[in-house]
């Protein structure tokens, strides 16, 4: 315990560590501010002039305008949403074949008359996409029968989409469909919508997770490498507790520091992020806010927590691997370069290899659950599967399973390899 306490103090007295901790804390309010600031709302004032408000004011206007189209979105509300759009389109000569992108539709008319049904109509169009091409019908093409059959069609759309992405019906795509529908059966219907949080907010949770893991990686880089660089490790290893006990203490101290930092920063970020919107919006179904093809039976708030937990598991795996690299490299600079390279490697693989091999490779890497374009956040809202023979494995399962194993593996290897180095 004495050595462990000394290692904690050593880390907290390091200038670079303190700077990185401060950066992690400052990023929380900065990133939490952006999603809400992007929101805009346009209306006509008493003089007939269009006025655009942004940020919190726009969110309040949107919530005020939502009317009956919130709470449980029943078949009656689906029909009412479709009728509202048809009445709106009928007010324009020839209708609106280009939808809201018609040049005759002003921003204020859209916001005040049909923006409150836009998300619902988009999900209806998505559910009735052509199973052979994946192309969704336009809003004008929707029928009352499709509105009343929306919820039963959602399951069929999941099935059609997985077959379309997987190259048709086969034993392995059947396995994927079975897993997806098993999860979708647990989705609460009718879907729930509460004004507030936006899809951008969910993406920012994933972005902040990546930045936290990046910061924690650089915090841990010098744990072993700094002594290797100055050759102080040769002296330390001559002491009675300078090998195994010191290695274990350093590993535990590093993991405790970055783990505590992650939990504190993530809690602060989620609190500030959701406070900038409206906590009521956390009850919205993912299937309405994001896509009907999301088969996770969770609300927006539950997904945010899940992303945070998944990020923590990935952090542990990445931290253990970083400690392993720190003990193997001769300088802090080389350890930093190697750690950063492995952190962004899943993103490189995602862009370079799109097939089944690429999915396996990026998910099995220690940092496979974080990234700007390839993270657990996107995988949890996608229908991507990796295949082993005829067995389908949903990518989030693969990411978290690999991270859990790698955390234990590399934590042990970090201590063993450092102790044996120089023998």
Please provide the spans of the model-predicted regions.
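Aromatic- and glycine-rich beta-strand/loop motifs that create alpha-glucan
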Residues: 1-18
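Junction motif at the cytosolic side of a transmembrane helix
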Residues: 5-7, 324-328, 401-423
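Membrane-helix interface segments
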Residues: 16, 242-243, 331-336
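Secretory targeting signals
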Residues: 26-79, 146, 150-227, 248-328, ...
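Transmembrane helix segments
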Residues: 33-37, 332-368
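Long, solvent-exposed extracytoplasmic domains/loops
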Residues: 72-184
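Transmembrane helix boundary and interhelical loop/hinge segments in multi-pass membrane proteins
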Residues: 220-235, 239, 243
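Short hydrophobic, aromatic-rich alpha-helical segments embedded in or entering the lipid bilayer
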Residues: 359-383
């Amino acid at each position: 315990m004495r050595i462990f306490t000394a290692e904690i103090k050593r880390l907290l007295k390091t200038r670079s560590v303190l700077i990185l901790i401060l950066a992690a804390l400052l990023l929380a309010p900065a990133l939490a501010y952006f999603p809400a600031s992007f929101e805009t709302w346009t209306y006509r004032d008493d003089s007939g002039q269009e006025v655009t408000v942004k940020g919190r004011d726009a969110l309040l206007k949107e919530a005020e305008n939502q009317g009956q189209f919130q709470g449980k979105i029943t078949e009656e509300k689906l029909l009412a949403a479709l009728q509202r759009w048809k009445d709106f389109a009928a007010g324009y000569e020839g209708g609106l074949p280009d939808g809201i992108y018609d040049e005759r539709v002003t921003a204020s008319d859209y916001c005040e008359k049909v923006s409150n049904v836009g998300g619902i109509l988009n999900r209806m169009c998505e559910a009735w996409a052509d199973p052979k091409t994946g192309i969704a019908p336009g809003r004008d093409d929707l029928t009352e029968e499709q509105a009343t059959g929306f919820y039963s069609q959602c399951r069929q759309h999941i099935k059609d989409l997985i077959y379309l992405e997987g190259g048709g019906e086969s034993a392995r795509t059947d396995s994927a469909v079975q897993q997806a529908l098993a999860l979708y059966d647990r989705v609460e219907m009718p879907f729930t919508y509460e004004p507030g949080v936006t899809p951008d907010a969910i993406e920012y949770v994933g972005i902040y997770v990546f930045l936290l893991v990046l910061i924690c990686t650089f915090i841990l880089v010098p744990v072993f490498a700094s002594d290797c660089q100055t050759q102080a490790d040769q002296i330390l290893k001559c002491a009675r507790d300078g090998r195994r006990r010191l290695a274990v203490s350093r590993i535990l101290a590093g993991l405790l520091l970055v783990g505590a930092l992650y939990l504190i920063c993530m809690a602060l970020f989620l609190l500030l992020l959701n406070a900038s919107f409206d906590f009521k919006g956390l009850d919205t179904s993912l299937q309405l806010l994001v896509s009907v093809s999301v088969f996770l039976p969770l609300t927006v708030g539950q997904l945010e927590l899940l992303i945070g937990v998944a990020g923590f598991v990935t952090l542990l795996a990445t931290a253990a691997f970083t400690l392993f690299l720190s003990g193997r490299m001769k300088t802090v600079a080389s350890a930093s370069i190697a750690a950063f390279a492995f952190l962004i490697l899943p993103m490189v693989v995602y862009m370079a290899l799109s097939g089944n091999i690429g999915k396996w490779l990026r998910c099995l890497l220690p940092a496979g659950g974080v990234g700007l374009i390839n993270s657990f956040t996107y995988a949890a809202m996608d229908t991507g599967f990796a295949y082993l023979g005829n067995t389908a494995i949903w990518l989030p399962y693969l990411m978290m399973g690999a991270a859990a194993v790698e955390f234990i593996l590399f934590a042990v290897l970090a201590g063993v390899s450092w102790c044996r180095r120089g023998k």
